[in-house]
Amino acid sequence: MQPESKKQRLQCEFYMEKKKRRCGMSRNLSSKYCSEHQILNENTKRIPCPLDPNHTVWESDLDSHLKKCNKLKLIHQHDNKPYFLKDCNAITTEDSNTTVITKDSLQNWIMKTIPVLKNFFKDDEKNYLSNVPLDIRKNHTMEDKRFPQLNENDNIGKKYHAIQQSSLIQNMIDRNILQFKENSLANFIEFGCGRAELSRYVNQVVIKNSEEKIYNPHFILIDRSTNRMKFDTKMKKDALEFNQNLNPPTITRIRIDIKDLKIDPLLQKDSKYIAISKHLCGVATDLTLRSLTYNPDDNDFLQGVCIAMCCRHVCNSNNYVNPDFVKSIIGNTNTEEQLPYDQFFHALTKIAAWATSGDRPTSSDENNTHFTNLPYTERQELGLMARRVIDQGRCDWLQQKLGESFKVELIRYVEPSISLENVALLAYRK
């Protein structure tokens, strides 16, 4: 019996002049060239993938690619999920993100926005700080556990994160957002959770203070990105380490954009819930506030909110929760030419970045080339003013939505030397 002949390999037909031979790579039956030399085929070209322009495909392979593209799986990963509702927390307009803003236009808007800010704070130039109290607190349970793990060789940033988490947790405890009564806590939702570090330390503190009590929490971790070195498994191990009589927490991690998130299908029925986040970036804060108030019936079970905000420079006028507050500031200014809301707000976000642009002047200050001709210290103060306007609008909006049974306030939970992004929004029952 004769052995079967080997199937003939299809070799790339590209001829390499320098080596005086054909390319040694394999090709498809339908092509003359391998993938490396396919670009030489005049009948094919690379085009952006319609599902994700960040990568390209051969035009001839488009149909087959669309059936297996990873982006397709991501687009449909939440199909028929009860917690998914497209753009339920976002406000979209036809002209969103279509206007090209030139450098000159932006600088012009900023120069017109600066006097409006100064006018708003003219009665008390430090009003933007004095009305946001510095409320630094320490949680000894968290610090006794975490600080010994941070030796002198660790990145100082790790200790700064721990200090921030300690203050946020103790501020929640002192306002009865975190309680330690039997069955008093069931749902924790961390928005923009990343690795879920804040949830882990909240979990540890509640476990430590729930000895001899029933503890069966549900942590709902929300983030639109994938994350490495997550704390999900460690949160379950912490329960056994701190108290072996307690059940480990239930953890639900969902990769989803907050703009599409309905939280009520995720909550345990008739159980209280707490919303937390540390350094929730830009517009994500506005989307989160809308998510929390999307179904007014959920307010009956809301125990509290703790959101440490950041990155106001990436907020946008369409999705900001309280445009009326900003419009009232524009309208109360006696200027010859008032900017439209969208232009004013865009300038406001850029000015807000000046509050966190470092602790010393830049080269543009040394050369006196900054387009505002303002010194660094004055720009930093204007940045704090702009940030205060954005935060106060959110605070007022949430207070209106939650009603008289809640108190909503802003605090500075650490010194600027620990974090320049040190303002948190707290909501708790009176």
From Swiss-Prot:
PROSITE patterns: ZF_CHHC_U11_48K
Cysteine pairs bridged by disulfides in the record: none
GO biological process, one term: tRNA nucleoside ribose methylation
Pfam families to which the protein is assigned, alphabetical: TRM13, zf-TRM13_CCCH, zf-U11-48K
Gene Ontology cellular component list: cytoplasm; nucleolus
An annotated Gene Ontology molecular function: tRNA 2'-O-methyltransferase activity
Location within or outside the cell: Cytoplasm; Nucleus, Nucleolus
InterPro entries: Methyltransferase_TRM13, Trm13, TRM13/UPF0224_CHHC_Znf_dom, Znf_CCCH-type_TRM13
EC number(s) given by UniProt: 2.1.1.225
Keyword annotations from UniProtKB, A to Z: Cytoplasm, Metal-binding, Methyltransferase, Nucleus, S-adenosyl-L-methionine, Transferase, tRNA processing, Zinc, Zinc-finger
Keyword check for rRNA-binding: no
Membership in a protein family: Belongs to the methyltransferase TRM13 family.
Function noted in UniProt: tRNA methylase which 2'-O-methylates cytidine(4) in tRNA(Pro) and tRNA(Gly)(GCC), and adenosine(4) in tRNA(His).
Protein name: tRNA:m(4)X modification enzyme TRM13
Species for this entry: Vanderwaltozyma polyspora (strain ATCC 22028 / DSM 70294 / BCRC 21397 / CBS 2163 / NBRC 10782 / NRRL Y-8283 / UCD 57-17)
UniProt gene name: TRM13
